[in-house]
Amino acid sequence: TQIVVEKGGGRKEFEFTPGPLFTNVLLADEINRATPKTQSAMLEAMEERQVTVAGKTHGLREPFFVMATQNPIEMEGTYTLPEAQMDRFFFRLHIAFPKFEELKKILRQTTINESYTIQPVFDSGSAVAKVAEMRKLVREVLVSSDMEDYITSIILATHPDNKDALDSTSGGDNITDLVGRYVTYGAGPRGAQAVTLAAKANALLDGR
């Protein structure tokens, strides 16, 4: 953001001050409580890895990673996330209510005086380099032409007006009919990129 700074002789000028976006990992807690104007400001950051203030572009740190939480129940004081913003997230996970044993574990860990130490995966000095190396390694995983065809078919199958969807059924219903009934807008090219990169990362973790 820009703040007013008083210079010599009583002269005042706007001076750029980096905000919370200038970090490696950004956690947007309850992002749906942010106003549409605030949410739209994140579009450039998430896609271009930069922000533009007063006509000047400022690059963000690499790697730049955004995580967000959303309250799916409470509606008061919340705003609908723009489709363009949701499309920029890699995954959207729905967290179910804890099961019996999970809830007991939460009780044990949060209602006693014992403290827990988080063990870092790697030291802060080498973190950026290691993450960059891992991201590069994921992209080097080979994907066959058949797999690319399959991923492309999955993405196209999410479009109601698609004519090239996979000819399959689910519980007796044709996939095309299900999509036409429940989906308004299908996944875009970013969806295909996300599925491909997720498959590559999963294959790498599996030693393939």
Predicted features along the sequence, with ranges:
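Conserved ASCE/P-loop NTPase catalytic core
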Residues: 1-93, 99-100
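Conserved AAA+ ATPase "SRH/arginine-finger" region at the nucleotide-binding site
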Residues: 90-102, 120-122, 141-143
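An amphipathic alpha-helix signature
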Residues: 100, 104-108, 148, 152
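Conserved phosphate-handling catalytic cores of large alpha/beta enzymes
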Residues: 111
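Basic, amphipathic alpha-helical bundle interface domains used for macromolecular binding and assembly
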Residues: 114-208
